[in-house]
């Protein structure tokens, strides 16, 4: 089982090697990188390429590790017992299976995505150490050991909001997705917009990287935001010339709200455009 890329995802040689290293070592692949660099999409594309069902667990600040294993619905069982329900006799009716339970008991190998693990509290990764390492956990309510029939291919993504514990890191294979350079970005754009005119691509790419390289920018635009912007430019049939307008009444290129998400960054970009015009 080897990942060799897909036509829908521009994967570097290093990234493909990392995916295959995680498969060989039978360890989770921990993927870090800026938001919008394709971390989540990587899991989706690998699962598709290897013909594996994909289970996804999207982490929030309130998510607890136990939810990934199972939850016992004691309230419903108490209510049903008061109503004299027959199903109350079987405790399995009140076990809500989490994504790890589903992955471990699947009839075939699956891919498992634990998305944005750094959003949870600091103890969250530690609480999953044993389960991800040994691929098993115990359900005390039903008194059964849930052990993986087939070891899932685990992807874990992080935006670096919090540092992850060393003990957790030791159990993963790590890959950092670097922000694409202009050449790689052009390949990514070509996958999504194969018929895009070179003039519009060149003008949009120049504007995009000018914005990203602005000193003092609070939030740099991501790959996904560039793709959103291009989609809007095409939908509105905006020509390449409009992105490099010399009209002093036009402060910034059209639809730049797809790239810049606060007023300070818009103001910074307006100053850059003004300086560039004065230097022509």
Functional labels for PLM-detected ranges:
Residues 1-280:
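C-terminal regulatory/interaction module of P-loop NTP-utilizing enzymes
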């Amino acid at each position: 089982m080897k990942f060799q890329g897909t036509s829908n995802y521009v994967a570097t040689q290093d990234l493909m090697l990392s995916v295959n290293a995680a498969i060989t070592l039978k360890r989770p692949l921990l993927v870090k990188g800026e938001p919008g660099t394709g971390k989540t999409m990587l899991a989706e594309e690998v699962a598709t390429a290897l013909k594996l069902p994909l289970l996804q667990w999207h982490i929030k600040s309130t998510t607890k590790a136990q939810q990934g294993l199972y939850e016992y619905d004691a309230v419903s069982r108490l209510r049903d017992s008061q109503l004299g329900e027959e199903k109350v006799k079987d405790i399995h009716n009140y076990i809500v299976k989490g994504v790890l339970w589903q992955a471990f008991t699947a009839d075939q190998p699956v891919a498992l995505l634990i998305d944005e693990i750094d959003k949870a509290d600091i103890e969250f990764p530690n609480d999953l150490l044993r389960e991800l390492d040994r691929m098993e956990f115990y359900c005390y309510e039903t008194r059964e050991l849930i052990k993986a029939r087939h070891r899932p291919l685990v992807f874990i993504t992080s935006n670096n909001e919090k540092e992850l514990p060393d003990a957790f890191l030791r159990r993963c294979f790590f890959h950092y997705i670097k922000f694409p350079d202009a050449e790689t970005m052009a390949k990514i754009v070509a996958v999504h917009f194969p018929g895009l005119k070179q003039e519009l691509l060149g003008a949009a790419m120049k504007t995009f990287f000018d914005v990203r390289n602005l000193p003092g920018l609070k939030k740099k635009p991501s790959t996904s935001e560039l793709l959103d912007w291009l989609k809007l430019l095409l939908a509105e049939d905006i020509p390449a010339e409009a992105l490099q307008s010399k009209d002093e009444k036009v402060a910034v290129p059209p639809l730049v709200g797809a790239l810049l998400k606060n007023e300070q960054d818009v103001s910074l970009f307006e100053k850059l455009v003004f300086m560039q015009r004065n230097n022509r």
